[in-house]
């Protein structure tokens, strides 16, 4: 468990879950064993996941990345240039309609590789359980 996290009432973390710095796990969220919750991410109340929650993102419902955690990023002093680079990466990774491998390659060639973007890409590449899906992703092939 990282530093500065928020773990609200009723949140359930199974064994070997890793929660990175400044992550927020809202009330009554459920996290499957061996999952990772990324830095400055947020799980909305009543969410559940058996996949990794990427850093800097808001996760909702089941395995669904809704958006960047823009309020959290600003509260922690991230400037507009860093947020813009993350937003560009986010749009390709979670809204671009590409499979994750192609999306990673596109981000590496088209987006400014700031420290934050590199951290996001490294987190996704290191995932053993897979990361949460972008909103609107056809998940039928994964079920």
Predicted ranges, named:
Residues 55-56, 62-143:
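Terminal amphipathic alpha-helical/low-complexity segments used for targeting or macromolecular assembly
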